[in-house]
Amino acid sequence: LNHIKRVEKIIDNVLNKLESDEEFIYKEKIACILHDTGAVLGKENHAYRSYLFAKDYFINNDIKFDDINLILDAIKNHSDGFETDNLYGIILIFADKLDMTKERLSYYGKKVKGNKEYSHVNDIDITIENNNLKINFITDGEVNLKEINEYYFTKKIFKGVESFSNKLDLKYILLMDNKEWKI
């Protein structure tokens, strides 16, 4: 639940900075709330299970709105759909991948090489001005850059930022403690 709240906060922050309309933000938050419901049975194939849950939920509760299929597609493809043309999808991917701070890590996650380096990330600052996106990972100064850069999920974070930026025609830079971060 905390992950969902943090992803929702990123979505709200970013979409307000982009001056998105309230209806779009509302629908994006629906995708956010439902995107990991399938993870209760494990991470493997959780995006597809989340999609099935959301689809059944909408049908069983007679929830209908235009672009509901785009919301369902965003949920279904949020794990690896980096090449999507679905704006809901790319925003969900972006926000979901960016939620990698010490708050997200489980006890066991802190023991995994590479992943444990995110336990040193205290916050993420996102700035959007004049078509420039700046993402600054604020740490306690103890991050092992070699380990974090080699970790598979770091590549997903960078890919999510790149895809989001390309879709919205933004120039982007990732920073760690105000220094450019490249992998």
Where are these regions (language model features)?
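Divalent metal-dependent catalytic cores for phosphoryl transfer on phosphate-bearing substrates
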Residues: 3, 16-128
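N-terminal low-complexity or amphipathic/hydrophobic leaders
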Residues: 6, 10-14
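Residue-level marker of positions within ordered structural domains that often coincide
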Residues: 12, 80, 166
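Terminal helices and disordered tails flanking the catalytic cores of nucleotide-processing hydrolases
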Residues: 99-183
